[in-house]
Amino acid sequence: MIITRTPFRVTLGGGGTDLPSYYSRYGGFIFSFAMDKYMYLNVNRPVADDFIRLKYSQSEKVEKVSDLKHEIARACLEKLSISNSIEIASMADIPAGSGLGSSSCYTVGLLHALHTLKREYLSLHRLADEACNIEIDILQKPMGKQDQYLAAFGGFTVLEISRDGKVLVTQANVSSGTLEDLKSNLLLFFTGVKRVNKKILGEQSRSTIQNKKKVIESLHYIKESGYRILDIVKSGNITELGKMFDEHWKYKKRMAKGITNPEFNKIYDAAMKNGALGGKISGAGGGGFFLFYCEEGKHKLRS
C-alpha cells in the first residue's frame, strides 16, 4: 500500500502568466507557497481480483481502465500502463473547485504513488512535468503549469517559465520571522462557490492570443507585481503586500468575464472596510477562496 500527501497552493504573485498563451510570447513568472492543507491518496494492489476500484466523491468499479469516468485517474493509469488489479482512494482537506490547485494535487499525488508502486524513482521536476503532460497535453485542460510544480515541490517556490515552456524552479529564501507574520496576517475565506475554471481560463487564453490590449496589459502588470511581491517577502517588509494585492485585484477583474460578480465585490468591499489592506481571489476566479492581508482587527474580519 502506498500513501501520498500533496500540498495545496496559494499564489502570491504572477498568477495567469503560466498559461501557454502568455508565456509562449512573453515568458511567465509565478511566486506561490504550499499550504498545510493536503490531498491524500491511497493506492493498493489487491490480490483477490483484477478489478479497478476508484473512490473519491464517487465510487467506481470497472474491468477496463478506459471505462473509468475519472479522467485524471484514467489518464495516469494509461500513461503508466497499469491495466488491472488497482485500488485508488482519495481524501482532501479542501474540496475540488477551490482555486487552490486540487486537480493537480490529485494528479501529482497519484503519479507519485503509481511510480512508487512500480519501484520507479522520479525527480520532483520530472514528476511535475509528467503531471503537466497529463492535464495540459493529454486532457487538454486550459490551465498553466504552476499547480503541478507547486504540488510537487511545495514550500515557497518561484517558477520562471521560458517561451519554450521550460520551467526553472527556485526556492525563495523566507526568514522564520516573515513566515510567522505571513501565517498570522494572511487569511483565506471561502466564497461558498465552487468554481469551474475552464470557461474563464479559456476566455483569458483567447484574449491573449488575440492580443487584446486590456488583457495583455493586465498580465504584464501581474507578472511585474509578482517580482515585486517576491522582493517584499524576501525583505520582510510584508505590510506592502496588502497594497500589492489590492492593485492585483483591480487588474485581475479586467481579464475575463466571470472572475468576479456583485456578490464577490460585496465580500471584497466588506473585507476592506473591516481591517483588510488588500486581497485577491484564488486561481482563475469565479469562486473558490479570497486571500486577504490583514494586520489588525482579524477577529472583526472573520466575523
Language model segments and positions:
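Short clusters of hydrophobic/aromatic residues that line enzyme substrate/ligand-binding pockets
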Residues: 31, 94, 100, 159
